[in-house]
């Protein structure tokens, strides 16, 4: 007969240095296919250690162990898992069922790790439970079954992948006499059908059910009744319908997610408290980004209304130059020279004054701006009615008023403003256009009018000098290069740099930089909150691994690879973080809606789908990173120690 199990000089020692204990000493043993063997011995004789080695849960320190012709010492942990999964079925004294799974779910576990097709394994598991007298009990949890029924579930689990070798550790130890006899009858029947059965027991009555009895004492075989194949049938090959890699991965992922949800449901409060850290962390990050974007957009809109490609030129070397009033070198000829430059779109000379505007007995203080014809293009001011000046050099008595002026002077008169003659101080002027008022809050009630710069210079101010020049640059012109060229041109004309240049693009960049710095600081605080929540996830996952050590041992015993265990716990961590991330994004949007409702138009929180996707990706990454250490710890557990932790 074929040698199925063969041990040659196997020894197993535990401990290091002087603190060592030898449990097995030079054990030689051969078991052929179809035998039913009982290994008997007192407590501490080494029989459980021998069974663990035969079941590829443990490895010897010395000697060789061959299972179905393969040297177990040469196999990797994943290859040992494959041997357990495909050749060995365990029946434990304490059943070792996973409490959160039904009887059917417990039986299916080895088949899941063997890549069996879902419907096929479910039919096979149902048939096994029915054959063992558990029909109608498939969906009961272990706590709803008697001890004998739980042991039958354990037997069905051992057979789901074929169970060429059945290793039974004290199979009747936790059962009453009747249930024990039923289990022994099942084992005898399995052996008759071709399964190789190895029982470990301390009870000679149980051992006598086997055809071969091996006695252990202090780690050595002291008696062996001799081999005898008792099987009367050849074990049929199990037909398993295997799935493709991707379908298998999907199946395992689904099973891991179900286990994760059950674990989260079992510890609702702990899961909720863990998730809160992720919820507030993600919510704070997304909200800070949205508020920062809203503030930035509002600031840019304000600056845009001033014209970011507009350069303003004023007399004096700086704002605190005491000689500004005496400088008379900024003249209309400078504006003409600038207008000839290829990088300039339009130019407007400027003269400022203030005086009363009067019409039919109505009077108001007006800000009078002497400007060129292209001023409205330079500043981007919209003309609602009428046209600009016919000419800006010949002191024409024309005026353009804004909406505030029209309301203050012409409302309730029943007259159209266009074409009417108004007085600016003592200078009469015809209204030729109406411009849109500045919508900034600081100018909402200001009355502003525009006249040709020559008119203001000669008829109102009486000085042939400008108070400023506004220049609009062409699109796609480098602002810094243009400002440098303007400065060089005016310096050559004046012989000295007696002017100052302002460009709102520089102001915009400065404000954007400041805003970005402030946003980054707040974002860092939000990220610290998220990091604290992430550490909480890792902490809870480590606790979960400790609490579920026994479950990990059971899964390893029935054939789970290290990667299977790692995947399960990483998925659980990712699931916690994903749910927390989704709730955090929802909380952020609710917070943004409340802010927009209560901010009274200061600025609005602006959300983007990119930020939401990034937050969702971030929560997934957190689950993977902070779930890795607990998952790695779970995957590296010793199955023997894990099984003993119940």
UniProtKB/Swiss-Prot annotation:
The chain crosses the membrane at residues 272-292, 518-538, 570-590, 611-631. It is found in: Cell inner membrane. Its EC number is 7.6.2.-. This is Macrolide export ATP-binding/permease protein MacB 2. One of its GO terms (molecular function) is ATP binding. Residues 5-243 form the ABC transporter domain. GO terms for biological process: response to antibiotic. ATP binds at residues 41-48. Part of the tripartite efflux system MacAB-TolC. MacB is a non-canonical ABC transporter that contains transmembrane domains (TMD), which form a pore in the inner membrane, and an ATP-binding domain (NBD), which is responsible for energy generation. Confers resistance against macrolides. It holds the Pfam family MacB_PCD. Homodimer. Part of the tripartite efflux system MacAB-TolC, which is composed of an inner membrane transporter, MacB, a periplasmic membrane fusion protein, MacA, and an outer membrane component, TolC. The complex forms a large protein conduit and can translocate molecules across both the inner and outer membranes. Interacts with MacA. The lineage of its organism: Bacteria, Pseudomonadati, Pseudomonadota, Gammaproteobacteria, Enterobacterales. The gene is macB2. The keyword Transcription regulation does not apply. It is a multi-pass membrane protein. InterPro entries: AAA+_ATPase, ABC3_permease_C, ABC_transporter-like_ATP-bd, ABC_transporter-like_CS, MacB-like_ATP-bd, MacB_PCD, Macrolide_Exporter_MacB, P-loop_NTPase. GO terms for cellular component: plasma membrane. Its main location: membrane. Keywords: Antibiotic resistance, ATP-binding, Cell inner membrane, Cell membrane, Membrane, Nucleotide-binding, Plasmid, Translocase, Transmembrane, Transmembrane helix, Transport. Belongs to the ABC transporter superfamily. Macrolide exporter (TC 3.A.1.122) family.
């Amino acid at each position: 007969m074929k040698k199925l199990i063969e041990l040659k000089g196997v020894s197993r020692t535990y401990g290091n240095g002087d603190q060592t204990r030898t449990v097995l000493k030079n054990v030689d043993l051969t078991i052929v296919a179809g035998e039913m063997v009982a290994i008997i011995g007192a407590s501490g004789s080494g029989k459980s250690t021998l069974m663990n080695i035969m079941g590829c849960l443990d490895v010897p320190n010395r000697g060789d162990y061959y299972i179905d012709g393969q040297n177990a010492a040469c196999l990797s942990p994943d290859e040992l898992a494959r041997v357990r999964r495909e050749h060995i079925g365990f029946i434990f004294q304490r059943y070792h069922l996973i409490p959160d799974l039904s009887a059917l779910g417990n039986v299916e576990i080895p088949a899941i790790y063997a890549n069996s097709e879902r419907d096929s394994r479910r039919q096979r598991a149902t048939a096994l439970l029915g054959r063992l007298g558990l029909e109608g009990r498939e969906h009961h949890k272990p706590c709803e079954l008697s001890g004998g029924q739980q042991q039958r579930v354990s037997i069905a689990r051992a057979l789901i992948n074929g169970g060429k070798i059945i290793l039974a550790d004290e199979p009747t130890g936790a059962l009453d006499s009747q249930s024990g006899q039923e289990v022994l009858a099942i084992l005898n029947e399995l052996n008759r059908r071709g399964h190789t059965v190895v029982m470990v027991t301390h009870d000679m009555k149980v051992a006598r059910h086997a055809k071969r009895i091996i006695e252990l004492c202090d780690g050595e075989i002291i008696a062996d009744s001799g081999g005898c194949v008792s099987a009367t049938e050849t074990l049929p090959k199990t037909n398993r319908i295997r799935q493709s890699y991707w379908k298998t991965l999907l199946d395992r992922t689904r099973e891991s997610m179900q286990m994760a949800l059950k674990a989260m449901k079992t510890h609702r409060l702990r899961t909720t408290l863990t998730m809160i850290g992720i919820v507030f962390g993600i919510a704070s990050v997304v909200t800070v980004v949205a508020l920062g974007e809203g503030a930035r957009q509002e600031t840019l809109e304000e600056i845009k209304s001033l014209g970011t490609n507009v350069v303003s030129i004023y007399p004096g070397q700086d704002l605190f130059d005491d000689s500004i009033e005496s400088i008379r070198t900024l003249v209309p000829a400078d504006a003409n020279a600038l207008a000839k430059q290829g990088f300039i779109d339009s130019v407007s000379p400027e003269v400022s004054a203030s005086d009363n505007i009067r019409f039919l007995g109505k009077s108001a203080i007006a800000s009078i701006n002497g400007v060129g014809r292209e001023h409205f293009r330079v500043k981007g001011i919209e003309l609602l009615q009428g046209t600009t000046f016919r000419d800006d050099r010949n002191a024409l008595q024309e005026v353009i008023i804004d909406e505030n002026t029209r309301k203050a002077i012409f409302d309730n008169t029943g007259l159209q403003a266009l074409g009417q003659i108004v007085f600016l101080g003592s200078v009469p002027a015809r209204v030729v256009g109406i411009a849109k008022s500045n919508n900034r809050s600081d100018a909402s009630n200001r009355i502003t009018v525009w006249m040709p710069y020559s008119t203001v210079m000669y008829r109102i101010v009486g000085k042939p000098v400008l108070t400023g020049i506004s220049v609009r640059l062409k699109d796609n012109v480098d602002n810094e290069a243009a400002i440098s060229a303007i400065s060089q041109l005016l310096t050559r004309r004046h012989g000295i740099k007696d002017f100052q240049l302002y460009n709102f693009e520089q102001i915009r960049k400065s404000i954007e930089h400041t805003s970005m710095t402030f946003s980054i600081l707040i974002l860092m605080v939000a990220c610290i909150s998220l990091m604290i929540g992430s550490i909480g996830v890792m902490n809870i996952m480590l606790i979960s691994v400790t609490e579920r050590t026994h479950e990990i041992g059971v899964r390893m015993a029935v054939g789970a690879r290290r990667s299977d265990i790692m995947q399960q716990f990483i998925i659980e961590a990712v699931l916690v973080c994903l749910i927390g991330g989704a709730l955090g994004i929802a909380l952020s949007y609710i917070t943004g809606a409340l802010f927009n409702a209560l901010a009274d138009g200061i600025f609005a929180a602006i959300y983007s789908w990119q930020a939401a996707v990034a937050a969702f990706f971030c929560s997934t990454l957190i689950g993977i990173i902070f779930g890795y250490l607990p998952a790695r710890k779970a995957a590296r557990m010793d199955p023997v120690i894990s099984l003993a932790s119940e």
